Amino acid sequence: MVYQPAAGARDLLPLDVAQKRWIEDKLQQVFHRWGYHRIITSTLERMDTLMAGEAIQRQMVIQLQNSEDEELGLRPELTASIARAVVTRMTNLRHPQRLYYNANVFRRIWENRHNRQQEFYQAGVELLGVGGLLANAEVLLLAGNCLTALGLQDWHLILGEAGITRSLLDAFPINLRAKVRSAIAHLDRITIDTLPLTDELRERARIMLDLRGNSTDVLQKVSSLNLDAEQQEAVNNLQSLVELLESGGKFPIILDLSLIQTIDYYTGIVFEIVNNTDSQARVLGRGGRYDQLLGLYHPQGENIPGIGFVLNIEDLYQVLLTTQQLPQETPASDWLVVPENPKAHSAAFAHAQKLRESPDLVRVELDLGGTDIPAIQQYARDRRIAQIAWIKADGSLIIEKVSQ
């Protein structure tokens, strides 16, 4: 019998891990430079925690039960878990809270495909306790900084505003609103043309479909929709954000007020980070503002503003494979320590430990015996080991540099 991973699961071998760590380390350096601190939440959550924001479909969650028959689920995303942790464990800390994560998530994928991946790796940030222009700009600029740190140049940001889009949909009859929303989300003009709408509402829906492009054109189009004071203020805030982002130089933005995320807890800006180089566009990450989500977990229902984004490690990996930046080999050891005979075993362990205690990271292997000198030298060449330390019983040594 050949034992295989469970359907949808996979193993990461040493080179896979080295490449994944390369990406994660680059992102972590950026998060630290922006003053963010790592949070680690439970892989298992109560189902009521995961479902509180009405953002996650129950059938997506891989469910378990504990001994008390309590419904549990493997987290399909991190924001709900972090929201729970912040309002229950971090209430005495001052805002804003700048948090980042690097974790795996699990989603049940209902497709007729064997071994459809169900475990994913993500990295992202949550900026909690503050709203407004500067907080929005910080998170978007941080996302751009992450891509720059990875050496990615051909990307753009698709920026929408859930509050504006939702309020524009309020003009449609309740019984048709969901269909209009779905048609706009899928850029489905045929459905818009066939729904039983008045001429005025049909034209409004068509305009909403076309609210995508450069910021000047989109903001001009949306302003033609007879906005009320609240809607106009949201448009003005969006314009201020775009101007701030673009004032610092090249920040590739496509404004898209038809952008409707499947996650429904977003209340303000929403965005997707899209790679341009593939023949087919690849979404590298997404995020948005969720000023009412934390209130669902707060004991007194107090709303705490929040905004964040997630980057998909697998999608970043696929793009980076084409750039030749990822490690092509696992790290080589610096030393191979070889006891010349059994009496030298103790001295060999002592010398290897001395090398490992260097202030800098030094990778040291110990030869475990059973081979002759030529085989040991060939092993060192095959493993790209830089030096061999031949250890005698009295602790003296001969250093051999290995020619590759």
From Swiss-Prot:
Keyword Zinc-finger in record: no
Entry keyword set: Amino-acid biosynthesis, Cytoplasm, Histidine biosynthesis
UniProt cross-references to Pfam families, sorted A to Z: tRNA-synt_His
HAMAP family tied to this protein: HisZ (MF_00125)
Location in the cell: Cytoplasm
Family annotation (PANTHER family): HISTIDINE--TRNA LIGASE, MITOCHONDRIAL-RELATED, HISTIDYL-TRNA SYNTHETASE
Matches recorded under InterPro entries: aa-tRNA-synth_II, aa-tRNA-synth_II/BPL/LPL, HisRS-like_core, HisRS/HisZ, HisZ
GO cellular component terms given for this protein: cytoplasm
Quaternary organization: Heteromultimer composed of HisG and HisZ subunits.
Protein name: ATP phosphoribosyltransferase regulatory subunit
Protein's pathway: Amino-acid biosynthesis; L-histidine biosynthesis; L-histidine from 5-phospho-alpha-D-ribose 1-diphosphate: step 1/9
Gene3D superfamilies with a match to the protein in the record: Bira Bifunctional Protein, Domain 2
Entry keyword annotation includes Hydrolase: no
Other noteworthy facts: This function is generally fulfilled by the C-terminal part of HisG, which is missing in some bacteria such as this one.
Family membership: Belongs to the class-II aminoacyl-tRNA synthetase family. HisZ subfamily.
Protein purpose: Required for the first step of histidine biosynthesis. May allow the feedback regulation of ATP phosphoribosyltransferase activity by histidine.
GO biological process, one term: L-histidine biosynthetic process
GO molecular function: histidine-tRNA ligase activity
Organism in which the protein naturally occurs: Trichormus variabilis (strain ATCC 29413 / PCC 7937)
